[in-house]
């Protein structure tokens, strides 16, 4: 009942978004995704302009995309601030694991330091996606040749960046999801809730 009342009060406190704001928000997310892909998965063409003059078109598109992205982000920021959505966002709680029996929560409660260290190490290991990003951005710095072999090298770098970045976000979400406060003893092992109830009855 308490959880239902809390959810009801939270839903009442939420400020509804207008249709125009929702459209601009979706457009901004789409443009930001394109800009994100362009920044991290597309090589810089600055070193190709001298050998391939038409590469300047890609450079111009890159600049236009960056300007549009910045403009949309600024517009959404001021619309959020004007309508008071930032206050509502600050009230929202971070997502936590809601499973009754969760091995990750059990490991966190039993070995809290090891749990934090393990996930931080995994996040730091996948952080070498920065290496792939750097190699992609400066792919044409030393060699401006464009052929099938070079494109296959670029594809392997892009695939490596996608995999490492996906792992980075996965482990980061897992770290945040299972790092919340765990009530009681229900997730210590597979029979945590049952064993706690039995020990309580025996005592």
Swiss-Prot record:
Record key words, sorted: ATP-binding, Membrane, Nucleotide-binding, Transmembrane, Transmembrane helix
Lineage: Eukaryota, Fungi, Dikarya, Ascomycota, Saccharomycotina
Anything else known: Present with 967 molecules/cell in log phase SD medium.
CC terms in the record's Gene Ontology section: membrane
Annotated TM spans: 60-80, 114-134, 157-177
UniProt keyword Oxidoreductase, yes or no: no
Localisation per UniProt entry: Membrane
Native organism: Saccharomyces cerevisiae (strain ATCC 204508 / S288c)
InterPro entries linked to this entry: DUF4668
Membrane-related topology note: Multi-pass membrane protein
Keyword Lyase: no
Annotated ATP binding sites: 192-199
Gene Ontology MF term list: ATP binding
Protein name: Uncharacterized protein YLR036C
